[in-house]
Amino acid sequence: MTTLERRATISIASVFGFRMLGLFMVLPVIAIATGDYPDFTPLMLGVVLGAYGLTQAILQIPLGLLSDNIGRKPVIMGGLVVFILGSFVAAIADTMFGLMLGRALQGMGAIASTLMAMVTDYTAEQNRSKAMAMIGGSIGFSFILAMMLGPLVTGVFGLSGIFWLTAVLGFLGILVVQLVIPKTSKTNFNRESMADLQDISALLKDPTLQRLNVGVFALHFALMAVFIGVPSILANEVGVTGSDLPWVYLGLLGGGFFLMLPMMIMSEKFAMQKSAFLVAVMVMALSAFCLTFGRTSLITLTLLLLFFAAFNLLEASLPSWLSKACPVGNRGTAMGVYSTCQFLGAFAGGLIGGWSMQKYGLNGVFGSVACMLLVWWVFALGLQSPRPLKTLVLAVGDIEHQEFLKIISNVVGVEDILLVEGEHLAYVQVDRLVVDMNSLQ
């Protein structure tokens, strides 16, 4: 990576991290902290938790397309301003309705797809996977940090303190965008990172992508629904006090990561991705199902550890699988649909989890999660193990398309080629285990 690429990537990753940290800090505490609100019901709790997912799902692709026309920075700045406004509304709210409105406004600052497109503007093709890995790492770190900071901030400043801190993080994001991210006059259209509305209908019919989209919906449904019940279980049944809560979450999430790592490495090494995938879904489903029975402290913590270990594996596996399975030149659009399903899953998990809690109690929450995950497991049975495919974006220049196709088609390991009139780019899908990269230079 060049100095410019590294600076841009770290800056974009930090904006991602600030935003995700603000959104997730409420998860471990909101179920307990809102219990005395005048309009509190478990259903309203679920709506508050998932509200950001609905608005983000609706707006993320349109805002990404808008950034193609007016530039990345104006859209990102506007999204962060709306995010800060939502944080203000939630911070001063003393009702569940006010919290719901604030969380919905936070989600309306849907800048994830625009930030990903900005990565394309600043990084060369050969460095893009490194940039995406850095951003993924920042999101994962933000999630773990949020689970620790949420209880700490709430213990000192109350629930409103989380939203005030979130507003500060939004301001920090604005400063990074304005002062740290390098200036550029170019906005590259790259089908590997940006959506094209004309391709959506075809991608929705792809059987493999359908299963992966159902998967990410179910995964984030489960995550959001579980956090309706987990805080009260830890407080009332396990007996975790406020000062110990951050360390318990660190143990669950950190321990889950280290449990997941060997399984992921082995599945890649021995080409057992599908088997590991199905096992992880079933582990999540069984963990949720077992939580509906009599719970002791040790059993509860063990089941939650297994749940988060499987979650970590699936959260890391799904985007990688999607990038290998999507048709050449359609990764940006496929990721847009995938992210929309992810956010809709978060909204549905909050809504249905809250309704289940209100009607059937904690067992209803974990039962609904187990059912959703079992449905996903059945869908996932039809998946084919991913091939080691990678899409390269090559500059065509002034060479004739037919001549380029003739040259590139003779390269061993080339699986598919997409040339789009007027773009001067070729999207070439290759088998990483066979292709000679030097022959594509």
Please identify what each model-predicted range represents.
Residues T2-T3, P182-N213:
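Juxtamembrane intracellular "pre-TM" segments in multi-pass secondary transporters
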Residues P28-P42, I228-D244:
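Short amphipathic helix-loop junctions that connect adjacent transmembrane helices
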Residues N69-G79, E268-V281:
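Cytoplasmic membrane-interface "Motif A"-like loop-to-helix N-cap segments
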